[in-house]
């Protein structure tokens, strides 16, 4: 899985695992008497913030997104997630069934997570251009600031941000909103494919 390229291991916490090499070495130096050596378990210390576009044109990609989410939960000890619809505005949510009732202000999300989080947006980037560029462009909420401003806040706050697009790359140039988002992301939009994921993880791990 391409996510494994985004690894930075650290030994943290109380959980321990067998240090096989040290156990063999210590046992040999102990006259053959078993001398078990333990070491703190290695954890992937990379911090990841996943933001998924849900609903509408993203429905055909639900299974792909679920697989990505499951893989990320296994791979990263520090993984947080939020949902948005079409584009990021001033509110995000974690329970899509309560998207109108339990919305977290995006500004609070930005305050909650440090610059060292690797941010991964997942969405098809297909929408009316005014949904990105205009106040009130959201089809779900009344957004006072254009979505483009909010995406800029993410790219300025976090050290590394990428956008994974499940739509085949050959179609991107035909969608104006996709081209706008590519520009806002400084071309750090990648296909949600093995090759695209490898490219995205290589960038995030620099």
Feature roles, as predicted:
Residues 47-53:
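Short hydrophobic beta-strand that contains or immediately precedes a catalytic carboxylate
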Residues 54-63:
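Short acidic, Gly/Ser-rich segments with clustered Asp/Glu that frequently serve as metal-coordination loops
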Residues 1-46:
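Acidic/polar low-complexity segments with low predicted structural confidence
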């Amino acid at each position: 899985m391409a996510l494994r390229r985004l690894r930075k291991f650290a030994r943290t916490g109380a959980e321990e695992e067998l240090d096989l090499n040290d156990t063999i070495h210590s046992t040999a130096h102990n006259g053959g008497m078993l001398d078990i050596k333990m070491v703190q378990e290695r954890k992937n210390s990379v911090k990841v913030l996943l933001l998924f576009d849900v609903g509408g044109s993203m429905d055909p990609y639900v299974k792909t997104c679920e697989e990505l989410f499951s893989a990320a939960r296994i791979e990263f000890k520090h993984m947080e997630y939020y949902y948005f619809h079409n584009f990021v505005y001033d509110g995000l949510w974690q329970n899509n069934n309560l998207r109108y009732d339990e919305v977290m202000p995006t500004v609070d999300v930005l305050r909650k997570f440090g610059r060292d989080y690797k941010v991964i947006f997942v969405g098809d980037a297909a929408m009316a251009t005014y949904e990105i560029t205009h106040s009130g462009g959201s089809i779900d909420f009344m957004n006072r600031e254009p979505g483009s401003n909010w995406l800029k806040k993410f790219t300025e706050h976090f050290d590394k941000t990428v956008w994974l697009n499940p739509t085949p790359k050959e179609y991107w140039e035909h969608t104006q909103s996709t081209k706008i988002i590519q520009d806002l992301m400084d071309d750090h939009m990648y296909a949600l494919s093995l090759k695209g994921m490898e490219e995205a993880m290589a960038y995030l791990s620099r």
